[in-house]
Amino acid sequence: MKPFSMRACLLAGVAVLFTWPFAQADQMQPAAPFVMGYANRLSCVPGEEVSFHLSASTDSVGLVIERVGGKRVKVFEKAKIACATQPIPDRASSDGCHWPAAYTLKIPDDWTSGYYEATLTAGEGKKAARGTLFFVVRSANPGKNSPILLQLTTNTYNAYTNWGGHSLYAYHDRDGLQGHRVSFDRPLRSQFRTWELPFVQWAEANGYALDYAVNSDLEFHPEILKHYRLVLSVGHDEYWSSPMRDHLEKYIAGGGNVAFFSGNTCCWQVRSEDRGRALTCWKQWYNTDPLYRQGDQKLLSTLWSHHLVERPENQLTGVGFLWGGYHRSHGQFMDGPGSFRVHRPDHWIFAGTGLKRNQRFGGKDTIVGYECDGCEMKWVDGLPFPTHGDGSPKSFTILASCPARWAPGDCYWYDRFPKDREGAAVLGIYTQGGTVMTAGTTDWSHGLRGNDPAVVRITRNILDRLSK
C-alpha cells in the first residue's frame, strides 16, 4: 500500500475512466543503449518452452540465465540473439507490449525448481546496457524433492511495476494517476530480492529444500497443492484472486498447512484476465468496477475486508490489514521497536528460544516493519485475545504483537474506517483442518538475513513441525 492525497484520488477516478481509452500513440523509447524484455510465462516445468520477448537498441543481445537461491548458479548462456527496437504501445501497462519472441528455450529436464533470472546485455564493454527478466521453474514431480511449496508474490510485483507509465498506484505514475489494470506482458520489477531471497538463502543454507510456484499457480494449477504438506508466503503478498483463495482454503480444510511469513497479505482482491497475463483491481474506486452495477459484489476488485465483499483476509490468514497498518513506515511509529512482544512463551512455536512473557525479539533487524497485519483484540489479565468480530477463526491464538497504524491518507480507501485507530502486527496461529501460522509483517525474513537467534529458531520450529 502507498498513501496518496485526496486530490490525487479524485483525479485518478476521472482520468482512469475517461482519459486512457483515447490516448493511443506509442511512447518514446529510452535513450540508447538499452535492452529490456519479459517472459511469456511466469512459471513452467521442465520440458515446457518459455519465450523471451525483447527490445533493444542493438541488433543482437546476449542472454545469461542463472538460478538465484542460496547461490547464483549459471545454467544457460547464448550470445548474439537477433533483436530490434520494438514499439512501446501507449497502453503497454494495462494491455501489454505484444512484442514478438526473440528467443524460445525448452526448459531442460535437469533444471531444479527455483527462481531464474535472465540477464540481457546489449553492446560491449563499459558502455553495454543490461536488463533482467525472471521466470519460475516448478517441479515436474511436485512434492518429490520437498514437502514445502514456496509461492512467490508475483501479483504484487506486477501491481507495483510502473513500466509503460502506469501501475495500480498513483505515487509513481507517469501522469500522477492510478491504473486499474496491469499486464504481465511488459518488463516487470521483481521484489524477490527484498523479501523472498533472504528467506530462500537461509533455507537452502540450512538444509531446507523448497519447491517454487507463483501466485497465479494457486489459481491455474491448484492440482499441485495436494502434493505438499506446507505452503509458504513470504514478504509482500498483497494481491489475491478469488480462485487463489478458494483453492488454498480448500487445501487447508483438507489438512494442508500454510505459513504466512508475510504482511499486507491478501489485502486486495484482483481478477485475472487474459488467461492470467493481466490483473484488474479498482481498489478504492470499487463503485467504478463494472461488477458493482451488475450486483455481483462478492468479486469486487477492492479490499477483501470491504463490507460489500464480506470476505476479510482474516478468514484465511487469521489477521488483516484493517486491524494492522504500518510500523517504521509511512510516518507511523517511526521510532517504534521493530520487534515482537511475546505473550504466550509456552507455545511450541517458541520452543528452544528461551523467550519469556513480555520479552521482545527481532528488533535488531526490524522484523516488524513496513506493512503489518493484525486482528481486533481484547485484553484480559494482561493477555490479548481475538474478538473474532473481524473474521479471525475461532481457534486463532495471538502469540506476539507490536503496535501498528494506518497512514491518514489510507483511510479514504475504506469508506467505514475510523481514523487514528491503533492496530498491531500480530504473530498468531490457528487450526481448521490444517494449521495456519501468520507472522503479520512483511519483514520477517530480514531476521533470517541477520541471523537473529529467536527468528531463526521460531522459523525452524514452524518448518519442521508443519512440513511433516
Model regions and ranges:
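Helical hinge/lid and interdomain linker segments adjacent to catalytic or ligand-binding clefts
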Residues: 82-83, 87-97, 102-106, 110-112, ...
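Bacterial N-terminal signal peptides that target proteins for export
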Residues: 1-11
